[in-house]
């Protein structure tokens, strides 16, 4: 992902890429997104997923990650 925000969810600058990611997300029983902490509070052009049913795997869990309405966060 290129961005994660509380307003827009997971975003990417490429609309076609967002369509493919959205298509894949709709077909997954469990959803995981790799997102380093530099992408928090960033917004790109196209949203491909909301956070409510996604587990985020990240390098650093920050205090404000709870505001993103994600299912769970895991730190590597």
Sequence positions of predicted segments:
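Conserved phosphate- and dinucleotide-binding cores of soluble alpha/beta proteins
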Residues: 1-76
């Amino acid at each position: 992902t290129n961005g994660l925000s509380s307003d827009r969810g997971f975003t990417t600058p490429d609309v076609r890429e967002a369509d493919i990611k959205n298509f894949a997300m709709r077909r997954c029983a469990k959803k995981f997104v790799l997102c380093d902490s530099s992408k928090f509070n960033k917004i790109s052009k196209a949203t491909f997923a909301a956070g409510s049913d996604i587990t985020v795997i990240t390098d650093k869990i920050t205090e404000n990650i709870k505001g993103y309405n994600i299912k769970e966060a895991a730190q590597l």
